[in-house]
């Protein structure tokens, strides 16, 4: 209704609303104080009934009331029915009806393909694990061979008197990680911290406030990297989601989230300091800042300070000392026309600059780092769920706090910290930026200036006019997809990495993290959970004693190649129970769709037939269904073994899962489509990784062969042929090898030992044939490989048991080196 319609009604209050041609002329002649009953158009009155008679009007109202009650009852029934549908609490009859109402579209169902992809994925994962083990073994053998070669060179240098003396400044491997097993334990520890957010999300609440900044630096900048990689970003965002959930579960109002002693805001501030955040500030805020600074403006708005500045300018211009009082009140200064004129001009300039920043911020929404936007989305969604009494504006204020006050404003008032301007900022320019930031802060806080900052009140109009823009901007910030889609990573991500993740971490960071976890282990992990991965790793580290105290200024860094000690848990995610559940649900859905419609229950007091009853009746009615139904019932029993359902409630939990799948069929199929795409991508990546591993193994084998050849080059030069030249043979008596410490034990009888000669030769690099001869006849032949001996040495094995004799590993290596390498 427009303005004219409102005025027509108010000018003639006695006019009747319903239009009738017979009474129009009489309605303006006189006013009657008797209240009239206004009735809507006639629907239920008879033609000969008069509106002035009360009973027909009452009957009309009763009919409308009854009609309203029926509509309300239908709405309540529909709401109840929808709640049941969405929760999956449907009977078999209702599920079947719903299936019959849906269009069967087999082409868009990818259950079978997804399960096949998962089976292939597990197969490829296992194959890749085998290849990775082979590759690691080759890598270790190469390292041991090189180390052995180095030891030989040291011996030769000692003999020739050429070995250089050690200098005081020579770097040694840090004692903290000088043991390979200890190093591996730390690599397992930091991998677990990186991939299981529950541990770090718990730790941040257990550290002392004075340790918070350094700990967050370790967590965010060291453990997850400063530069953007999808894997680290995905893991870090998982940590933030869990931390926000924990934080908001322990506060009373959404406003408490912004208090100084809460943890998550500090985490978010640290997150914003990463490369993505600083790159955004340099690209968006930096140019505007430079433009404002170079203008050499003065945006002081306090009237008394403006008044004092005008007096100073007059003194400089005239060269005469002013007799005016500089210390005047706010109100007194505003009585001076030049002050009000100056302030008005500065307000206009301030608004213009605020417009520049606001336009830059809003227009660069798509350049805002994804992680910051997604964290804001989590804050909004979790706050909306936890604090149902909070208004949308109250939640948006929290988003504005993190986006502006803790991110953009920090860079505006201290641009040199982010290297946004290439010059020193004059105090006046910095004060200008502070004034601009205050105005924008009020805008992002949906607030206006009051009596405490009266000089900013002229900006209130501009703030009010742009509040809608800011609300829209903050709402658009949280319109982002999930990390799985944006970053193209998922739970199969770890299976497709060509190289293990690596972090560069300082020794104090390793020690501090170790000490922090040791101190708070019982708070992080329940005492009864002895098989918890964190407890297992910490138990291994405890075997090496407590971490040493390392000075905070010790800047030595080490590279940790992170590894998963619990690799089997990844394959367990692709459990047969999950596959069987999906398969059985699909079988039940297909069967219910094919069966004739079940009769509807007439007596609502009776219990609806359960799934087992329906299946048994179906196979009695149609014996051809016996194999399929038997398979379903067998699967249900297996699912019960996996604790995925139970016969105690007649498999109602399974039926609920079937109902939810049918109700949400379209959404589930879309999820299946995405899952299929992800699995296909993961499988392709695994196969690419497999090709890469095979290539690496081939290169490592060649390199290992080259290393072996270098070991033999001195000896082989004495032969006419190089690679295939046979070196040796070398002959030793039993007593000689025993005296050298090579043979440490033997089951050979004493009387026979004197007659035995050992002949050692090599026609393949790194492989040694040892023949035991008696009276010139071979009694026994053994084959030793230097790689195997070096590996035994590396794991601390001191002896090697062969048939009837036991060799000392170290002395055997020494002998072979001396014979074939020196």
Curated annotation (Swiss-Prot):
This is Ras GTPase-activating-like protein rgaA. rgaA lacks rasGAP activity in vitro. rgaA expression is inversely correlated with the speed of cell motility. It comes from Dictyostelium discoideum (Social amoeba). PANTHER family: CALPONIN-HOMOLOGY (CH) DOMAIN-CONTAINING PROTEIN, RAS GTPASE-ACTIVATING PROTEIN WITH IQ MOTIF. It is found in: Cytoplasm, Cell cortex; Cleavage furrow. Residues 234-477 form the Ras-GAP domain. Disruption phenotype: No change in cytokinesis as gapA can functionally replace this protein. Null cells project numerous filopodia, show increased cell motility during growth and form multi-tipped aggregates during development and show elevated levels of F-actin that is organized in large leading edges, membrane ruffles or numerous large filopods. Pfam families: RasGAP, RasGAP_C. Residues 161-822 are annotated as: Required for interaction to rac1A. GO terms for cellular component: basal cortex; cell cortex; cell trailing edge; cleavage furrow; lateral part of motile cell; plasma membrane. Keywords: Coiled coil, Cytoplasm. Residues 104-152 form a coiled coil. Residues 15-27 have a biased composition (Basic and acidic residues). GO terms for biological process: actin cytoskeleton organization; cell motility; chemotaxis to cAMP; culmination involved in sorocarp development; epithelium-like organization; MAPK cascade; mitotic actomyosin contractile ring assembly actin filament organization; mitotic cytokinesis. GO terms for molecular function: actin filament binding; alpha-catenin binding; calmodulin binding; GTPase activator activity; protein kinase regulator activity; small GTPase binding. It comes from the Eukaryota. Residues 1-36 are annotated as: Disordered. Heterotetramer. Quaternary complex with activated rac1A, ctxA and ctxB. Interacts directly with rac1A and ctxA. Preferentially interacts with activated forms of rac1A, rac1B and rac1C. Interacts with racE. Transmembrane segments: none annotated.
